[in-house]
Design a protein with these regions (language model features):
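Flexible, non-catalytic linker and terminal segments flanking ANL/adenylate-forming cores
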Residues: 1-46
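Structural core segment of the AMP-binding/adenylate-forming
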Residues: 2-19, 121-189
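AMP-dependent adenylate-forming
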Residues: 26-32, 51-75
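Short, flexible loop segments at the rims of nucleotide/cofactor-binding pockets, characterized by
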Residues: 40-43, 78, 126-129
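Conserved AMP-binding/adenylate-forming core of the ANL superfamily
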Residues: 44, 61-116, 133-138
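Hydrophobic alpha-helical segments typical of transmembrane helices
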Residues: 47, 51-52, 136
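Aromatic/hydrophobic pocket-lining residues that form π-stacking "cages" and hydrophobic walls in ligand
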Residues: 52, 114, 164
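A generic structural signal for well-ordered alpha-helical segments
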Residues: 55-56, 118, 141
Length: 189
């Protein structure tokens, strides 16, 4: 994997030099997942969930989320309430820290809630491309071993429920939390 970085202040006056810098950096392999160096803002040891709660405490009545196409506007306190409800629901159906929770959905409030709810409980949110067809969905879910899938019912002419049922007909007859689908062996909920 390679990384591209341009120090814009350093190379603002000399575009040609900046291009050479990018070419040079593109030839260097990425060898660190963490880059250590001085920063204006120090790193925090908080989790996303803990930091979110901290922000909510500081700004409970400030606007946090606007989803125009769903006509939704939530303050931080309202958004936190919804996030906590989803987090508790995920825990209640058996999602544990480290579990992979897939979301197969376009950008919407449910996607935002899932992002923060999974972070709060220590689950790993797996974003599934909303344009995926059944074979691509099967590959994605099986590759990362998703145990849970949250999905929209449909989007832009794609009926996600029908596609899931075609891939795993067992969905129609399973009990909640007890899915056993041959095509999706790790999916349980």
């Amino acid at each position: 994997m390679y990384v591209t970085h341009i120090d814009t202040e350093k190379h603002m006056h000399t575009q040609h030099k900046a291009v050479k810098e990018v070419e040079l950096i593109n030839t260097l392999p990425l060898s660190q997942s963490y880059f250590k160096g001085s920063r204006n803002t120090p790193l925090t040891n908080n989790t996303i969930g803990a930091y979110f709660d901290f922000i909510v405490d500081k700004n409970p009545n400030s606007l946090a989320v606007v989803v125009n196409h769903q006509n939704i506007r939530l303050t931080y306190k309202e958004f936190q309430k919804e996030v906590n409800q989803l987090a508790m629901g995920l825990l209640a159906i058996g999602v544990k820290p480290g579990d992979r929770v897939g979301i197969w959905s376009p950008n919407n409030i449910q996607w935002c809630l899932t992002q923060f709810a999974t972070a709060k409980i220590g689950a790993i949110m797996v974003c599934i491309n909303p344009a995926y067809r059944p074979n691509e969905l099967q590959y994605a879910l099986n590759s990362v071993e998703c145990s849970t899938l949250i999905t929209a019912s449909q989007f832009k002419g794609s009926n996600y429920i029908d596609m899931l049922n075609s891939l795993a007909p067992e969905l129609k007859h399973c009990d909640n939390g007890k899915l056993s689908a041959q095509a999706l062996p790790s999916l349980k909920m």
